[in-house]
């Protein structure tokens, strides 16, 4: 299971943040942290500080360990009683070299630590506990849980922590410096309105961090070997845009910056912002003089001064990579800029492809919105080439959500052997097409033979409890009460105005047990909000990280699955499985790897979806591939999937519908049984009006 350990640095969010869009609004002295399900977090606490722990989704125990100033376990500091041996935290940390080293450096004695378990296994959504600290301490908070069997509905889920500081300094600025990715080679603070140089070797990594948010940082990189020969070879923005086919590179296939000799200099590995500039110059004296600000500090002069020691010629302007600079060109060919998208702690991670001499600035512009009207510091770290870092952008479900780096699906190990063309979708890397097939061949294989495609980014939620059916009947347009156990239904999920929030499929696993498979993560938040409003006794548990899936589609898909899918006598076999039904199955035999098979798909062909835990995904892929060789099975990427689903008349958010489209306009009016569903549901009244008076033709 992937590491979910995080050592927390201070994150102060004050009431003044309301002036800065996109930043969290919390009372002065309140900090917010998260504990991922199946992981743990560590925070430093001072006397009289209050810790509020919220069990967001319920049915999740919490393990707490407290270390006093001497590094010894002391639960009494938080008025907690010992009732466990901290087994989960000890096991988790033992498997993580980085956090083990960190605890050792802080002299925290985990081996002899005891813990307190708070929250019951049946606690409700939103249940909370507040603890007050008697003394300075380090608190380790865990959300214990193992990998969820796909036949079960008990994923470990997140906890939210609010730390109310007894003493704090109120400030208008936030400053978040994320933990180092590993042991840094260089740590360089670039103070506001200045620039700093640094050198890296080929293969090493450069992390440029915006600790305060909304701060531009101009970046230059010189080829060190050429520089030693008196040649000033730097990143060429035009060459880069030409070769990469975009305004600037990003993580993935088109990720490199080039010099004027068409040689790659650096590669973008991670980018948590996704908005930069390669069209404009680093700010110059002329820029400010033209606005009437004579003698204003500027990045060009700062660069010239700092680069002088390398005998680099001064220039009137530098064509830099303007990190975090938010620029755009509109439909009328007018260039514009606005405040940066970067938030406190956001960063870009580069990998040097040559020995480089670099310089980074903390732009001094304070006369417009380029730096949010308030220049702040930049922080640079470099890392050894020995450790590899995943390629990623940051995914945020909501504006105040904790950013999540792009993940690899459980099937990525297998699909990455067949292609390098991956695109980011909903926080995951998915194959766009495959190297030895291509879009047309993949499309043809789906229509004539069989394909397998990775659809793991679909959001999964376990809906449990005595009011589970009532909640789904109220929030979905379909008549959920007509579902039998083992049945799947495709449905819309609407707002009160009748427009669509999401579409997806609902699995009925038991009388009070459902599994919602949707396209958007917010659908889970919506379900929680409605459950709270209706005071339903129900749990909505996030399960996306525990259930990944591939679709096996095409005329030969049934024959492929028949070769390796075992089902108990009480379940329908693959041959018997009807349209929009699922079975509880295993691979090969009754003690084989657990899977769920549904006769569903997104292609219009005969097809099935196989659902499994990510740790079992490689085995599932191999089984499908081995069984499919006889039928010339082909992997299918997003490009070909788009072709087959359009031909089949299957809709996709952002294309055929959005939050201003009702189900009738989207072409799925069949999911709204207004005449036969007597119970009320969200949007029903408006949908009756919209059906009688269509808004769009």
List each model region and its residues.
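Intrinsically disordered, low-complexity segments enriched in small/polar residues
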Residues: 2-391
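Glycine/proline-enriched, intrinsically flexible loops and inter-domain linkers
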Residues: 372-697
């Amino acid at each position: 299971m992937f590491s979910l350990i995080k050592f927390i640095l201070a994150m102060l969010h004050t009431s003044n943040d309301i002036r800065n869009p996109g930043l969290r609004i919390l009372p002065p002295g309140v900090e917010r942290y998260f504990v991922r399900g199946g992981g743990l977090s560590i925070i430093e606490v001072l006397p009289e500080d209050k810790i509020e722990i919220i069990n967001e989704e319920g049915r999740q125990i919490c393990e707490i360990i407290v270390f006093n100033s001497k590094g010894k376990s002391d639960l009494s500091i938080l008025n907690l009683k010992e009732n466990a041996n901290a087994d989960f935290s000890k096991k988790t940390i033992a498997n993580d070299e980085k956090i083990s080293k960190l605890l050792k450096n802080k002299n925290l004695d985990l081996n002899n630590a005891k813990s307190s378990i708070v929250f019951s296994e049946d606690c409700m959504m939103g249940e909370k506990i507040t603890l007050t600290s008697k003394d300075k301490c380090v608190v380790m908070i865990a959300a214990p849980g193992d990998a969820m069997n796909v036949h079960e509905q008990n994923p470990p889920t997140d906890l939210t922590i609010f730390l109310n500081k007894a003493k704090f300094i109120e400030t208008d600025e936030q400053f978040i410096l994320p933990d180092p990715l590993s042991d840094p080679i260089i740590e360089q603070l670039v103070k506001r309105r200045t620039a700093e140089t640094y050198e890296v070797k080929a293969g090493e990594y450069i992390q440029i961090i915006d600790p305060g948010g909304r701060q531009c940082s101009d970046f230059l990189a010189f080829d060190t070997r050429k520089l030693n020969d008196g040649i000033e070879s730097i990143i060429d923005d035009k060459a880069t845009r030409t070769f990469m086919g975009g305004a600037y590179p990003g993580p993935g296939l088109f990720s490199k910056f080039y010099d004027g000799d068409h040689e790659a200099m650096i590669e973008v590995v991670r980018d948590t912002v996704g908005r930069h500039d390669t069209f404009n110059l680093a700010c110059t004296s002329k820029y400010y003089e033209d606005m009437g600000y004579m003698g204003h500090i500027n990045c060009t002069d700062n660069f010239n001064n700092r680069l002088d020691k390398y005998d680099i010629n001064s220039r009137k302007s530098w064509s830099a990579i303007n990190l975090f600079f938010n620029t755009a060109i509109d439909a009328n060919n007018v260039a514009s800029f606005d405040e940066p998208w970067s938030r406190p702690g956001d960063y870009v991670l580069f990998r040097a492809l040559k020995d480089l001499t670099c310089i980074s600035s903390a732009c001094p512009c304070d006369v417009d919105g380029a730096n949010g009207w308030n220049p702040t510091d930049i922080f640079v770290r470099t890392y050894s080439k020995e450790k590899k870092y995943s390629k990623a952008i940051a995914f945020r479900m909501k504006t105040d959500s904790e950013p999540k780096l792009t993940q690899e699906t459980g099937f990525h190990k297998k699909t990455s052997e067949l292609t390098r063309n991956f695109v980011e979708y909903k926080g995951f890397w998915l194959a766009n097409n495959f190297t030895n097939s291509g879009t047309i061949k993949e499309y043809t294989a789906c229509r004539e033979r069989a394909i397998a495609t990775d659809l793991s980014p679909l959001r999964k939620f376990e809906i449990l409890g005595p009011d589970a059916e009532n909640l789904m009947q109220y929030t979905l347009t379909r008549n959920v009460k007509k579902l039998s156990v083992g049945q799947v239904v495709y449905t819309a999920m609407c707002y009160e105005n009748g427009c669509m929030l999401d579409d997806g499929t609902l699995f009925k696993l038991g009388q009070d047990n459902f599994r919602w498979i949707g396209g958007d993560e917010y659908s889970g938040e919506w379900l929680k909000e409605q459950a709270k409003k209706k005071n339903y006794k129900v749990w909505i548990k996030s399960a996306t990280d525990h259930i990944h899936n591939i679709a096996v589609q095409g005329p030969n898909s049934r024959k492929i699955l028949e070769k390796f899918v075992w089902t108990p006598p009480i379940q329908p076999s693959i041959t018997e499985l009807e349209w929009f039904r699922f079975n509880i199955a295993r691979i090969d035999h009754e003690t084989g790897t657990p899977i769920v098979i549904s006769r569903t798909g997104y292609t219009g062909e005969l097809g099935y979806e196989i659902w499994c835990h990510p740790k079992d995904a490689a085995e599932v892929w191999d089984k499908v591939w081995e069984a499919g060789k006889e039928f010339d099975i082909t992997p299918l990427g997003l490009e070909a999937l788009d072709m087959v689903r359009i031909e089949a008349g299957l809709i996709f958010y952002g294309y055929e519908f959005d939050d201003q489209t009702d189900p009738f306009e989207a072409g799925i009016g069949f999911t709204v049984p207004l005449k036969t569903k007597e119970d009320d549901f969200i949007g029903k009244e408006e949908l009756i009006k919209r059906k009688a008076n269509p808004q769009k033709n």
